[in-house]
């Protein structure tokens, strides 16, 4: 089904991201990439995934062309940050971290990868 296709999943070390990667791998996906904030979190059964260590909280400061020098066919924006606190107690720094990881990083990755998807006239994005 996904033979000769490439996938990038943000948050691939979490339970949902890991399941997504496993599904694509078991269905013939050629190359699977994922982002993580800490390569130590990578599980031993994830050796088929090529991980990129990336701080999604500061993605606007990164050179995405250099970091992601490849195209993908499928982009799954799965990474998310939750600061367990009620809204009234949330600090501005916590709010900014949540927005940066959950929204701004997705915007920057979408902008980077969809240009290439449009050019080759194929691509799928899951948010």
Write out the residue ranges for each language-model feature.
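Rossmann-fold cofactor-recognition segment
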Residues: 46-59
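N-terminal Rossmann NAD(P)H-binding glycine-rich loop of SDR-like oxidoreductase domains
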Residues: 13, 17, 21
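A short, exposed helix-loop element centered on a Lys and neighboring polar residues
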Residues: 110-111
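Active-site loop of short-chain dehydrogenase/reductase
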Residues: 71-72, 117-127
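Substrate-binding pocket helix/loop in short-chain dehydrogenase/reductase
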Residues: 86-87, 94-99
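Conserved NAD(P)H cofactor-binding loop of Rossmann-fold oxidoreductase domains
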Residues: 78-84
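Conserved glycine-rich Rossmann-like NAD(P)H-binding loop of the short-chain dehydrogenase/reductase
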Residues: 29-42
